[in-house]
Amino acid sequence: MIQDIAPHRYDNTYHIQKPGAQDYVFCIQKSRILLRETVEEHVLTIPRREEIEAAVPELMDRAVYLFSVDEKPYFLVSVPEKEAEEILAKLKEGVGQMPVSDKNHMEAGKMASGALEGAEKEPEQLCYAWKTSTDIRAMEPMHQAFAAITAVQLWRWRQSRQFCGRCGAKTQDSKNERALVCPVCGQTEYPKISPAVIVAITNGDKLLMSRYRVNHSTYRGYALIAGFVEIGETFEETVRREVMEEVGLKVKNIRYFKSQPWAFTDTEMIGFFAELDGDDKIRLQEDELSEAGWYTREEIPDDARLISVGTEMKMYFKYGPDGEKKWQEHQK
């Protein structure tokens, strides 16, 4: 899964500090993140302070510490939409002259190592672009993808909590913890994390999978049934309710599988397996799903990457307890 980045180590301990020259900086506007990209292979890497500052020095006054990976700090700069294209133009002006560290290229991932060797010798083969969360899904290596999408999640939270929901005053960063505090009434806002369940429903040797409607999600692949926990519910009650609402089925033997921080939707996903209880006729919730059906193990497609708990659950059903290992063998 996207958070499984070992041997790399993610540390979300709160600090107040300024970025060093080689620290990573995420510039974000409208949930789009500024990344460096190789022209030919489209390998995405994260800019560092020195190159951002060389082109747009005033941005560094807005830098906020986020977290570290392997003791390397990552920072956030919120960018107003009206400034986005100007910033991009200034960065592009200097891309052919700007030194880019070898370490930054090395971290781009094993798949693109050949392309990056050329990029080190010819910096003009690099460009900058505003990328979406969908682009981050394919980003290598995994620890950089995890860092990028976590930064987007924290940006969304900060953007939505600029003013106090109780009295309307402008919020300020806490000096002691990752929180936004109202200086007038003391209201404290923490990062948004919404609990949600995702359930693999089995019917003998078949698994229920669905597809979202185009207007409901950007994800076009096969998905498991999922939904947010409502007030006053246990996770197991949420499983039963969501399954009934989305596909009109009853389930039993609900068993916990794994959990996952899913920054793409500000959620903590709690994965369960459950067995069909009774009639297998699907009654589709058409405003959310475009289709749903029962699939044998042979009919379940292999996803390109195991970044989500839902995908891991599908591979667990398809290949057994060693699902991830067998999935990797099939990718070779």
Residue ranges and their predicted role:
Residues 211-212, 226, 255-260, 276, ...:
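Active-site proximal loops enriched in glycine and acidic residues that flank catalytic Cys/His/Asp
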Residues 223-258, 272:
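The catalytic Nudix box helix
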Residues 148-199:
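Acidic, metal-coordinating catalytic segment for phosphate/diphosphate chemistry
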Residues 179-223, 228, 250-251, 274-276:
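N-terminal strand-loop-strand
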Residues 1-161, 172, 217-220, 285-332:
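Nudix hydrolase/Nudix homology domain
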Residues 260-283:
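Active-site-adjacent beta-strand/loop module that shapes the phosphate/pyrophosphate-binding cleft
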Residues 79-82, 229, 279:
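A short, internal acetyl-CoA/4′-phosphopantetheine-binding micro-motif in the GNAT/acyltransferase core
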